[in-house]
Swiss-Prot record:
Membrane-topology annotation of the record: Multi-pass membrane protein
Complexes and interactors: Forms a complex with SecF. Part of the essential Sec protein translocation apparatus which comprises SecA, SecYEG and auxiliary proteins SecDF. Other proteins may also be involved.
Location(s), subcellular: Cell membrane
HAMAP family: SecD_B
Matching InterPro entries: SecD, SecD/SecF_arch_bac, SecD/SecF_CS, SecD_1st, SecD_SecF_C, SecD_SecF_C_bact, SecDF_P1_head
Membrane-spanning parts: 9-29, 236-256, 258-278, 288-308, 333-353, 360-380
Keywords: Cell membrane, Membrane, Protein transport, Translocation, Transmembrane, Transmembrane helix, Transport
Protein name as it appears in the record: Protein translocase subunit SecD
Gene Ontology MF term list: protein-transporting ATPase activity
Amino acid sequence: MESKNRAKLLVSVLAIVIAFAVFIKPLVSTVKQGLDLQGGTHVVLQAQETPESKVDDDAINRSIQIISRRVNELGLTEPVIQRQGKDKIIVELPGVKDPEQAIAMLGKTAMLEFKDMEGNTVLTGKDLKDSKASADQSGQPVVTLQFNEDGAKKFADLTARNVGRQIAILLDGKVLTAPRVSEPITGGNAQITGSKDAKEAEHLAILLRSGSLPVKLEVVENRTVGPTLGQDAKDASMKAFAIGLAGVFLFMLLYYRLSGLVADIVLLLYTLLLLAVMKGLNATLTLPGMAGIILSIGMAVDANVLIFERFKEEIANGKTLRAAVNSGFSRAFTTILDSNVTTLMAAAVLFYLGTGPIKGFAVTLALGVLISMFTAVTVTKFILGALIGSNFTKNPAWFGAKAFQPKAKDGKGEAAR
């Protein structure tokens, strides 16, 4: 039995330590990071009601879809686009190199119109099938338009009726170009000239491809975090995390000895599982989120403290180490459960009512609490039970506890004669 427990102890401890050493660095580097850690742009867009467009759920949802297409076309990785309230849209663009140009693209309505000399709108962006940036024969940047079947017929009719005359191509009411028609164009294609460079042509093509916004959007908040500032915040947070974790490890080891060592090893597993779950859920790690992780580590340690104190009380009452472990965990479980349920309720409220960073804090806190329930109770009990069952020592002092002292019959604390 002792050899079996020793094998359990050795395998479990080695598995945790090796897994931590192998996976901690890849997990830390691949967990999705928020703007405050890696830099980027945070924009809040507010829908503006006009006589032509009404702000409702459908308009906001369609706007989110169009903005998502524009952001994806820009090639930005892991953007965050979500609704806030009834008329606002939050857009977070991590690692964006040209925030001003990106912001300009996000809120641009991009209403394309083809008008004749009388001012009649003949075609709109709805008649487009595709748009691409390219260069003409002289090397100048242009945007090539491809119309859908209905649009091709309209464009052929427009050019046939206006040979020798100009037609205007407008974007959001501003004339982009006004070419003179030399002959009817029946191929279903057109070109927009006037872009100052290839980048501007590409952005115009993206706007036209993604479609026009159903409502006007105005930038009401714009915050940019530089990559250097984000890296500094990340480094400071990691340093604080490492110092705090080392302090907890040292305290548990000095005060609870072998029990504390078990708790420290389990904390390694806790940290690993938390990062793995965050990566699996594609959760974003922010500065408030790191605060939530540190707080949840404190709660995991608090659970161990409750268990170990009950464990010490049971030993002081004369129970064997194994009986004290079982009884200590049973007595502490209700208190731990109550505390964690209360924290989960608070995290749920923060997530429901909060936005952005507050939600990040709530998510990491809730995940940490749930994982700590598993590690602090189940894993700690398993390893501690294997340690005691291996008969490494029967001295309670090795577990930070005092040995049972029988009371004297006269109640004065002296041994009966």
